[in-house]
Amino acid sequence: AQSAGISIPTLCHHEKLEPFGGCRLCIVEVESRGWTKLVVSCVYPVEEKLVVRTRSEKVDRIRKTILELLLAHAPDSPELKRFAQDYDADKDRYEKDASFCIHCGLCVRYCAEVKKADAIGFVDRGIRKEISFIPEIAARACNDCKECFPLCPTSYLQAAFVLTEALAFPSAPSDNGPAK
């Protein structure tokens, strides 16, 4: 769509990564073989005679709701604020959840697909799903890398790394007593 000049919002897309569909903002309405349905465009296969509506009352309403839900997790994200303005989304519609992570997966996927480090991963499922650094790997791989940090649309990753580093990456004890 982008190569054809069609703008579809997304928070989880990166040119170096495989499509993921995690943010759901790229939702579109497709019509094929007499059926109409909403799909995540970045992972939906193109087929002959497929009709795609990137903007409609229904698509815009769903995107607005998705943005309002994401804003409950990351109300100060500049990217979310920009999209919220485009779709007239209310950042106060849902009760705030102080997690700040919107589970776009950019950090997890970049670390795995580009860096081949697997130092970050998804932990748990459903409403308990989180992004977490794998201490044994992150202690070695992340200190000199941090290439995933600027990809995070909410800045959650930087805060999570600082906390993880403080709690889980202690200096190795020396022969002269405990590490300082």
Named regions from a protein language model:
Residues Q2-E31:
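A basic, amphipathic helix-loop patch mediating RNA/tRNA/ribosome contacts
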Residues R24, S32-K180:
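Fe-S ferredoxin-like electron-transfer domains
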